[in-house]
A protein has these predicted regions:
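Sec-dependent bacterial lipoprotein signal peptides
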Residues: 1-15
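Conserved Rossmann-like nucleotide-binding pocket used by diverse enzymes
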Residues: 13, 89-91, 158
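Bacterial signal peptide processing site
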Residues: 17-21
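Glycine/acidic-rich beta-strand-loop module
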Residues: 24-25
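Serine-esterase "nucleophile elbow" of acetyl-processing enzymes
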Residues: 30-96, 106-117
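Short histidine/acidic/glycine/proline-rich micro-motifs that form metal-
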Residues: 61-64, 68, 94-98, 128-130, ...
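Alpha-helical cap/lid subdomain in secreted, periplasmic
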Residues: 86, 104-249
């Protein structure tokens, strides 16, 4: 099982993993997820309140690597939130291969490119830092810089945590695993302790590369996190049945 976990977190950047950190360019401009009709369980009339804008800022796990249109995490999350009556529009700002340093470079560009200020930002980065064995201290500093940008604009955050595998070594593992809970506490943001927990030891939910989630794997990630997202939205109603045990600060 540790080997499977390492294969997931170590090669999230299958496309473009060897390139240098890209400068923000128009090609990195986030795209709004299609606002197609929500599923039958949530007709448009059932959607409550104004549009809730959510920014999904991350790497290939948000970018929908090798998935058909509409099957990525941002799209499926939007549908799941609408099924709960939340009038959500999720903007996909995932870029395959991004490290925390890449995210730090482009966060301001992404925020300046948005038509509306997000009601919530999902921050999901760090897997590619594991791939390259990059310094946990640098990863933490980069994530802190991203959170600083969001804090300055008064944008609430849900931080998607990652965990290093045991074969990364006990010292590296301890340092890396401490990043996300420490930042969540420092910045008073909500935390999903380990974003990949629903799929990391379930090969049937992974693509042939044994790295990226299949469409069913994405649905498992959404099912495990949709209530965390809903709770992180200021003023959003959340069903009691959906309560989970993940950290909420």
């Amino acid at each position: 099982m540790p080997r499977i976990l390492w294969s997931i977190v170590a090669v999230l950047a299958l496309a473009g993993c060897g390139s240098a950190a890209p400068a923000p360019t128009p090609s990195a401009t986030p795209s709004k997820v299609s606002s197609a009709a929500p599923p039958a369980s949530a007709s448009p009339a059932a959607l409550a309140g104004p549009v809730r804008h959510i920014l999904a800022f991350g790497d290939s796990l948000f970018a929908g690597y090798r998935l058909a249109p509409g099957q990525g995490y941002p799209e499926r999350l939007q549908s799941a939130l609408r099924a709960r009556g939340i009038n959500a529009e999720v903007t996909d700002a995932g870029v395959s291969g991004n490290t925390t340093a890449d995210g730090r470079l482009r966060i301001r560009f992404v925020l300046n490119s948005l038509a509306a200020r997000p009601d919530l930002a999902l921050v999901e980065l760090g897997g590619n830092d594991l791939l390259r064995g990059l310094s946990p201290q640098d990863a933490r500093a980069n994530l802190a810089a991203i959170l600083d940008q969001l804090k300055a604009r008064h944008i609430p955050v849900l931080l998607m945590g990652m965990k290093a595998p045991p074969n990364a070594g006990p010292e590296y593992q301890a340092q890396f695993d401490a990043i996300y809970p420490a930042l969540a506490k420092q910045y008073h943001v909500r935390l999903v302790p380990f974003f990949l927990r629903p799929i990391y030891d379930r090969p049937a939910l992974l693509q042939a590369d044994h790295i990226h989630p299949t469409a069913q794997g994405v649905d498992a990630l959404v099912a495990a996190t949709v209530e965390d997202v809903a709770r992180a939205l200021p003023g959003a109603a959340v069903s009691r049945a959906g309560a989970r045990s993940s950290d909420r600060l």
